[in-house]
Amino acid sequence: AAQRAVEGTESVDAQEQYVLALIMNSDYAKARQYIQLKQLDASRPTLRHVLKMSEFSERIQQGIQAAKNAVTMNRGEEAFISLDAVLAEMKAYEAQLPADPALRRHFYYEYIFALNARNLAEQAVAQIAKTGVGPMEMPTYVRHALADSYLRMRQPKKAEKLYKSLFAEKNYADYNVYAGLYFSLIEQEKFKEADKLLVEMDKQLPTFMYSNAKGVDKVTHDDRTEFIGLKGLNYVYRKEHAKAERYFNEIVAKAPANISYQNNLAIVQRWREKPELSQQTLDQWNSVEPIDQSSQITSMQNAQALGQIQSWRQQTQRLMRSAGDDTGVQQSKKALDDRRHATIQHRSTFSKSESDNDALLGRLKGSKEQESGTRLNSPWLNDNYRLFADHSNRWGDYEQGKIKDQRVGLGLEWASDRKAASIMLSQSTDGDRFGVQLDWSHWLNDHWSYALGFDSQADIPLQALAQGHEGEAYTMSLNWQANESRKAGAAYKLTDINDGNARQEFSAFFKQQLLQGPHYITSAALRGGYEKNDLGDYAPYFNPKQSYSAEAVLEHDWITWRSYDRHFSQHFEAAAGTFKQTGFSGKPIYNLYYQHDWQLSRTWKLNYGVGWGVHPYDGEDERRTYAVFGFEGRF
């Protein structure tokens, strides 16, 4: 009809309307030919720009849909071919933009939208200044794109403002808008507001989709499906892992064919320190093609947690090609890259002891003592091996002077598939006490692990060392955990000192988390110990024939400040119990400890703390004040 109306007329207005009609019908080639045929560039110079803007808009939408289809079909490496092509063309076309402010704004609005869809957040935000208006004055879809970009750039406060502005638009807010606002709140630690938003989402998001076709039943709306998953993950963000696992187990029982829910369950299982179970959950879908991308990412993270380095590396390399914009994949690559760097660990303890009986301190560790250990690790070699250098130093201040024990060592460590072994050769710095230390540990499954150790130059009491004695130590331990919140363990150590004393030590513990929240975890533990010494009181150091101890411990960890890779937390610990040794009645023991933990960056952390405790020995109390300092990081 438009073509018949314009045929035979020389009216420029009619010709313009005809071109606009062609544009509306996406007939861009014919519109371009008509502009050239009628030489409309002279009389309507902006018309070709209007055509180009419309063409860009349509190609952007097609590119976004093509990306979604490629991801669904597990062809992530092809996802952005179409979108990259239109972005390249838009970048080249920018120099041809007319002076008309409205057309220029329209171009940059579309450019921002496309850049955000391509996960190029910084570039999207950089276009704001070119529009000549503020973000709050922009169209709804552009504000949404900028909100997503700010969230990706770790600027959640700006994202929150833009997301909230979208709710003023009638019928615009869908799951994606709600979810964007939710994560902008979570990343600002606004957990209470995020909880309220979930309640509002439950009210506002549709539950079902209905079909007009006769006999077709209603189905769960996509927004509702996504919301059900987010509701479970909210428990995780609040550190309520048990609730999250219980929630997804119930959801999976109701919808066993939903891969997304199964993947969420697997994620929670890994966070609960059960990576084997997590992988078993995913393996149920091995025969389903194509493999869901989220499940591939979870499988990659499981390989990392299981110490399957080669598999972890292969999966990360593959996902970097198909899902390189995903933050989980990027973090995995950074963790792999970290293994190519040297690392360092250090811990020192300084203490001062007092007693009403000064002679008692001479049988313990002196009036002052220090213990420190530093280990420098090489980069990982061939994925599973690394060399390390170790320095340990301990000394005590006694009435007759300081007694020191300082050692340096070189070792080799191997780790793979939740097993680890190491050997270290060491030498004292002021003597010929050459030693060999062997260690082995193995996770049998998600719940049980054990460790074995041997040290030919054990850390025997300094008083025995000063008399020229040496000792060997044999250790073994067995640990159990239900998950991250409930753990128990037992250990045995035999120290054979060549002064005739054989010291046997048994210890056990049980630990249970009591309270969890977004910023805190409160735990309680029971610890017990038994010691037996063959030489008894004849030794020049504290050496009861037998001794027993039992104590209850309350711990509280509080994340005081957090910003992505950095955080500051405080640790409080209080312990009380009883100690009894042969020949003396039982007396109480106490200990208080307070520590600061700084995550300075993704790869460096620092801690320091102070403590005070009372412990009876030979019926007399030792009052000990101590300080702890430690750090670790990657060069």
PLM-predicted stretches and their roles:
Residues 1-4, 8-635:
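Gram-negative and organellar
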